[in-house]
Amino acid sequence: MGNRVEFAKMNGLGNKILVVDMRGRADRVMPQAAIALAGNAETHFDQIMAIHDPKLAGTFAYIDIINCDGTLAQACGNGTRCVVQALSAETGLKAFTFQTLAGILNAVEHDDRTVSVDMGSPVFDWNRIPLSEEFHDTSRIELQIGPIDAPVLHSPAVMSMGNPHAVFWVDRDPMSYDLERFGPLLENHPLFPEKANITLAQVTSRTTMTTRTWERGAGLTLACGSAACAAGVSAARTGRAERKVTITVASSPNRQALDIEWRERDGHVIMTGAAEWEWAGQLDPQTGDWQREQQAGHEASVS
């Protein structure tokens, strides 16, 4: 295998994830390797979740989260669920604490194999999201796409869930909007110095919503867990929905759903949903060269 490490191709509601086992190594998955893997039809991904040895006492691992353009991401809820499922299959453990670029994540796998991830507390301060302009009320900011007198999208709620999010409210199915056209413009808007994830959210009842997301550094994606968290929090914050909602991810296979709860007692956001193992292989973290396992692998494990 040479310089190769084990990896598993997984998905969270269709969000394509490569879970890479970098434990016992001092190097990391390089940007050029990520770009090469993203450019291959079989290994194309939305995020790489690279599992490293822990840097902090009391944590199981440090997780590097890498976008398909080679940049680092602070959070990936769907990817975290995949990591938990893989490590649970390997170790038999059900509860994990991880360190990421954004901080500490706690997660647990349930008996039905769904995974709950404590995504931490949302950040609403404009300079910590961050925004390039001062807004005292980030539940509704001045930003729109389209004519001034008839904007297609306008007045998003903005926040950070470890990464910047803008949630635009829409009155029909999010799939009916041309997010492929608007997404890149909004992701790279000067208002977002670190770029932003762009989500269209339709509130369908006090406890249900539908979303679609253009993901920072990944583009149009089938699902984005942190975006679902941002949408759920924003809906509760603006009085559109309760603090506990089921969010249908419109672009996911069979329109799958995530349960999002913005806990009142501590302000943390809990995301619960499924993850799915697809296949396993080995890859070179420097170049992105890879090979698929010839024999049937052990499901959902990367070791």
From Swiss-Prot:
A Pfam family annotated for this UniProt entry: DAP_epimerase
Top EC class for this record: isomerase
Lineage of producing organism: Bacteria, Pseudomonadati, Pseudomonadota, Alphaproteobacteria, Hyphomicrobiales
Reaction(s) the record says it catalyses: (2S,6S)-2,6-diaminopimelate = meso-2,6-diaminopimelate
Positions that bind substrate: 15, 47, 67, 77-78, 163, 197, 215-216, 225-226
Signal sequence region: none
UniProt KW Isomerase keyword: yes
Protein name, as recorded: Diaminopimelate epimerase
Gene3D superfamilies: Diaminopimelate Epimerase, Chain A, domain 1
Example GO biological process: lysine biosynthetic process via diaminopimelate
Annotated pathway: Amino-acid biosynthesis; L-lysine biosynthesis via DAP pathway; DL-2,6-diaminopimelate from LL-2,6-diaminopimelate: step 1/1
Subunit structure, as described in the record: Homodimer.
Function, in words: Catalyzes the stereoinversion of LL-2,6-diaminopimelate (L,L-DAP) to meso-diaminopimelate (meso-DAP), a precursor of L-lysine and an essential component of the bacterial peptidoglycan.
Organism: Allorhizobium ampelinum (strain ATCC BAA-846 / DSM 112012 / S4)
Any one cellular-component term (Gene Ontology): cytosol
GO terms, molecular function: diaminopimelate epimerase activity
Active site, UniProt feature: 76 (proton donor), 224 (proton acceptor)
Family statement: Belongs to the diaminopimelate epimerase family.
Entry's localization field: Cytoplasm
Keywords, alphabetical: Amino-acid biosynthesis, Cytoplasm, Isomerase, Lysine biosynthesis
EC annotation from Swiss-Prot or TrEMBL: 5.1.1.7
Residue(s) at site: Could be important to modulate the pK values of the two catalytic cysteine residues: 165, 215
